[in-house]
Amino acid sequence: MKSLAISLSLLLVTLAVTIMAARAQFAPPVIIERFKSHEIPAIPARDRAGHPVRLADLRGRVVIVNLWASWCPPCRMEMPSLERLAAQYPNDLTVLAISNDADGWPAIDRFWGQKFPHLRVALAAEPDLIGQLGALGLPYSLIVDRDGHEIGRIPQGIEWDKGEIKALIARSVASR
């Protein structure tokens, strides 16, 4: 009887922690505004052909660097809203979706398919890319202005084509 009570207590604690963690993943976005002088560091990633992806090549466009993985439910949930946002600004916004999948391109392809034609996918070239950028988990996104300066970070999955974040992207795209 005593072991049953202990087991039930552990089950309830585990359930409570799981529910709190799930809620935290979909909390309102935390945007950390940065000074314009904060230039984003090089991000080690490679495209499907194995070529390095360079943020410097995207200067002149607003860039969302989205760190994700195919096994991450919040990552998978936010991809359609990133696609819709990128489709709204095809000439001014690049969404660079950098996968942290250990299984590489086969894992990406199983999820990606042809679902996200407006997003540019890449694979992290180093296993600790998340840690290098100060992220504690996935998804994790950096917002970069047209001059290559970081203007915000989103440390969780969100709906990108709604609310405050959509307004920030619209303002960034409008500034030339």
Question: Model-flagged regions — what are they?
Answer:
Residues 110-118, 124-171:
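Thiol/disulfide oxidoreductase modules built on the thioredoxin-like
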Residues 63-65, 96-98, 142:
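Conserved hydrophobic packing residues within short motifs/helices of P-loop NTPase cores
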Residues 1-4:
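Positively charged n-region of N-terminal signal peptides that target proteins for export
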Residues 76-115, 125-131:
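Structural microenvironment flanking redox-active thiols in thiol-disulfide oxidoreductases
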Residues 25-55:
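N-terminal "domain-start" segment that seeds a small globular fold
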Residues 40-41, 63, 138-140:
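Short loop/turn microsegments at loop-to-beta-strand junctions
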Residues 9-16:
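Bacterial N-terminal signal peptides
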Residues 55-73:
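Short active-site neighborhood of thiol/selenol oxidoreductases, capturing the structured segment around
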